A protein has these predicted regions:
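N-terminal targeting leaders that direct proteins to extracytoplasmic destinations
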Residues: 2-8, 16-77, 94
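Second-shell loop/turn segments in exported
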Residues: 41-48, 86-96, 130-134
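Periplasmic peptidoglycan-binding/anchoring modules of Gram-negative envelope and division proteins
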Residues: 51-73, 88-121, 187, 194, ...
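Short, well-ordered turn and helix-capping elements at secondary-structure junctions
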Residues: 84-86, 92, 107, 165, ...
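Periplasmic OmpA-like peptidoglycan-binding domain that tethers envelope proteins to the cell wall
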Residues: 123-203
Length: 203
């Protein structure tokens, strides 16, 4: 009976050791959700302030260049917002010729894959059915990804594109002005593990 009493404890200890020894599943950004990609990699509390300061510098630089930029995830991620009308004709998935005026200045930051993981999310209003909005935004996200691929000299940029349809409006879909706000592109600059480690070493 004494031996049986300790069996659950032994099994629990064994399971803990096996779990610790098992290889951790690697994070795959291309199959992760947008929420997971914006949240990963996480920043330790003691590095959060320094990472937010570095991202704050990027936010200030891009604002000075005329972009609409917000710091999200406790200031650790920069989010650039561009109205779809500045990049695409209505219902079109090909970039306008003048779209490069908005996209090209971001290329140097997008190519800093050692510092930033770049997530591109395209949103729509609720005009048309859900399937149409999903396809439209997905095709537009891929068009932006392709633009940066060619703009970089056919180099892989590591951009992770998402077409999110009309599921995440920032304003009620009532009136032209509000619908235009909802038709938007969000470009996220997420600090990489390399940047976080660099900041940690330099503290």
């Amino acid at each position: 009976m004494t031996r049986l009493r300790f069996l659950p404890v032994v099994l629990a200890l064994f399971c803990t050791l096996v779990a610790a020894a098992a290889p951790k599943e690697e994070f795959d950004p291309m199959t992760a959700s947008i929420e997971e990609n914006i949240a990963f990699p996480a920043v330790e509390a003691k590095q959060s302030g320094a990472v937010a300061a570095a991202i704050g510098h990027l936010v200030a630089t891009l604002r000075h260049a005329g972009y609409e930029v917000d710091a999200v995830r406790k200031g650790e991620v920069a989010m650039v917002t561009i109205r779809c009308a500045e990049l695409f004709a209505p219902n079109a998935t090909e970039l306008l010729p003048q779209a490069s005026k908005k996209l090209a200045p971001l290329l140097p930051y997008i190519m800093r894959s050692d510092n930033y993981k770049v997530v591109v999310a395209v949103h729509s209003d609720n005009t048309g059915d859900e399937m149409y909005a999903d396809r439209l935004t997905s095709d537009r996200a891929n068009a932006i990804d392709e633009y940066y691929f060619h703009a970089s000299g056919d180099k892989e940029t590591g951009i992770i594109p998402y077409g999110l349809g009309s599921d995440e409006p920032v304003a009620p879909n009532s009136g032209r002005a509000n619908r235009e706000k909802n038709r938007r592109v969000e470009i996220y600059f997420v600090p990489t593990a390399e940047l976080i480690e660099k900041i940690k070493r330099n503290k």
